[in-house]
């Protein structure tokens, strides 16, 4: 399932490898925090020519960077970034329609840290994403804490995920035992098929 060499291991790469071993080509994929577009591009490659990828971000420069990256890589027929809040995800991926939803919380790399995801909005976005997932679908979230953004978002999302009913979801939290407490934290949520 995971084929990384230790020097290449990051929280984002781990989440990507876990998704790559889980999802199948085709279907609907959502990058709920598209940033510079690297996760959106990753999802386009997973989705393949039969799939469709939607990237969401509240910053115009993130949407532009993502759409440029997709075009440069010939993926603009598969994926598109849209200027929208991740809490509004259900407008673009109705309930039960998404195979995969990916979050990489925090701030836009290379931009001012004054604009970053917030606890209340992030929990609402995760709740919407879980509703958007098909049974058998998967959500990934990389959570951050630190000097700039504090701990509230990471803790709020973790608390929400840990409270999900086991009858409907399996939650995987990948802690790196010898990394700093503020290190990025990859999490995966598998939505169980009905009757399992």
State where each predicted segment sits:
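Class I S-adenosyl-L-methionine
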Residues: 147-196
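S-adenosyl-L-methionine
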Residues: 1-28, 38-41, 45, 64-95
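Helix-to-beta-strand junctions that scaffold the AdoMet/dcAdoMet cofactor pocket
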Residues: 24, 47-48, 133-135
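Mobile active-site "lid"/loop adjacent to the S-adenosyl-L-methionine
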Residues: 102-125
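Conserved beta-strand signature within the Rossmann-like core of class I S-adenosyl-L-methionine
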Residues: 33, 136-143
